[in-house]
């Protein structure tokens, strides 16, 4: 049996620092050295897409952690003047694309394509207009950027641009070339990655029995709505609906992967304490998130990896 190892990384904005620190700690554990080298496919959404591109490009985890610690404040840099011009964040995205573009060009290269990456990747985005000349086929649709061989791939796409596409979270950043954050349909892209392993257009296709999948979250806050009946309209629903849908999407992907892979699937999705809520742009919480990730009990994940990921 030849294992096919898939790493899936959720979206979560600046909370990606939690994932970066968790991966650092895992890579430092005895018996797990070089676990990233064994990856066959990395799939990611939003900040998870940036992590996936960085790993596939060959960046070490210290560089990737530095991206969040040093460059995060530049990317999520907002001023009172920007807010004023955007009418208190009611018009226009919160942040400009230019700082993230500069950072991604620096770390991924100006002209590095997906085809030049050292690992297979599957990066989620959403195409706002497929521009099909047939009006009966013109629509918006999910887009999965990948560098698998064969027809229909995206090997020519610039890596930094794909990073911009997957990270263009609505209200936070403008769309880029008509694409927005894949988190609108796959904030947890694990099922996307699993499905990609079975695409018969790309040979050889691994047996499902050979696939092992490690899914990493970025740190979650728990939400709930009290009561049993909610006769609400738009105003009441708009605030909880986004978190409700993102959590639902993530949860159903977790369910599907567990049902299909059983013990060959593992999800590491840490939850912040009940009193802690961290928006995806809260750069002031970076020190807290680092401490949080450094104190997590990773022993269940370490045991699973030694048994299913590292073992031949």
Regions found by a protein language model. Give the residues of each.
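Patatin-like phospholipase
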Residues: 4-8, 14-104, 161, 293
């Amino acid at each position: 049996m030849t294992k096919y190892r898939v790493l899936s990384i959720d979206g979560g904005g600046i909370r990606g620092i939690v994932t970066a620190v968790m991966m650092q700690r895992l890579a430092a554990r005895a018996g797990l050295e070089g676990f990233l080298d064994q990856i066959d496919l990395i799939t990611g959404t939003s900040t998870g897409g940036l992590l996936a591109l960085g790993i596939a490009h060959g960046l070490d985890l210290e560089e990737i952690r530095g991206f969040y610690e040093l460059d995060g404040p530049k990317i999520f840099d907002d001023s009172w003047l920007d807010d004023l011009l955007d009418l208190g964040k009611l018009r226009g995205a919160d942040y400009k694309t230019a700082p993230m573009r500069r950072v991604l060009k620096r770390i991924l290269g100006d002209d590095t394509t997906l085809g030049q990456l050292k690992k297979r990747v599957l990066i989620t985005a959403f195409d706002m207009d497929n521009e099909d000349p047939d009006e009966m086929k013109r629509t918006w649709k999910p887009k999965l950027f990948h560098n698998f061989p064969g027809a229909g791939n995206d090997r020519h796409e610039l890596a930094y641009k794909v990073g911009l596409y997957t990270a263009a979270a609505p209200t936070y950043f403008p769309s880029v070339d008509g694409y927005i954050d894949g988190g609108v349909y796959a904030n947890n892209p694990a099922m996307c990655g699993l499905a990609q392993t079975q695409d018969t257009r790309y040979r050889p296709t691994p047996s499902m029995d050979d696939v092992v999948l490690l899914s990493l979250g970025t740190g979650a806050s728990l939400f709930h709505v009290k009561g049993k009946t909610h006769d609400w309209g738009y105003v009441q629903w708009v605030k909880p609906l986004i978190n409700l849908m993102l959590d639902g999407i993530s949860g159903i992907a977790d369910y599907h992967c567990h049902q299909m892979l059983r013990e060959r699937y593992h999800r590491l999705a840490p939850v912040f304490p009940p009193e802690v809520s961290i928006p995806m742009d809260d750069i002031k919480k970076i020190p807290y998130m680092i401490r949080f990730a450094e104190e997590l009990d990773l022993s269940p994940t370490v045991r699973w990896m030694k048994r299913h990921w590292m073992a031949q």
